[in-house]
Structure formats: structure tokens, C-alpha cells
Amino acid sequence: MKHKKSGRKFSREKDQREAMLKIMLGDLLLKRKITTTLAKAKELKMIAEKIIGRTKKPESLRYLKSKLPRNIDLKTLRGIALIAAPKESGYLRVIKKGRRLSDSAPMAILEIIDEGKKTDKESDKEKA
């Protein structure tokens, strides 16, 4: 029975699924925005919220190195920690994008919310 079990399987084995999410998490932290399917974006958001929350604590460095790909350096983590500092949660946003042409899968943009930068919609509202 599937009681109190969260997470999606994505038709992959556990090690493949973890590797896929680890790579996507690294890309998200480096680029601050990725485009993927809606299901993967929602799953990655759950994982990334916990990881970004841990970047604020300097004693969590060893834990973070085990959960993140090797191409993420300390400078990147400090930049993420500065974004996460004023908040307790809600570091990420999932924006629905439409459907992919090839297989009609629902697509989404997953991005890190930066309080200093304003989105196009917010800047349009201020102009009006």
C-alpha cells in the first residue's frame, strides 16, 4: 500500500531517478532557471527547497556536497545562501509553460525567486 509515501518514479529505477534529479538540481543552482516537464519540476522543487534551506547553515557543507553534483562550488552555494537568507521557505517558483510539441507533455519553468530582481510582469505593473 502507498500510504504516506511521496515522490514520483518517472519510470526509472531508484539510482537513475536520483542521478537525474541531482543533475537537474545542479543545473538549477548554476543557471537559476530550467525548463522541464511539469512533473519533474514539481518533484525537483520539493528537493531543492530543502537543499536551499540548508545552504544558510555553514555546518551543512558536508551534507550539501553529498547531495549536489561536483560542479557546484562554494561560491555558488554562498550566492544561493544570500538569496535564501531573508526567507524561511518559498525560494522556488514553478511557471506552467504549455505543452511540448513532440509528445504533448506539460512543460514548466522552475526558477529561483530573487527578491532583488523583478520579473517582467512585476515591472509591467509598476509602469502601468
Language-model regions, residue ranges each:
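Structured, basic alpha/beta domains of bacterial-type, RNA-associated proteins
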Residues: 1-12, 16-19, 23-128
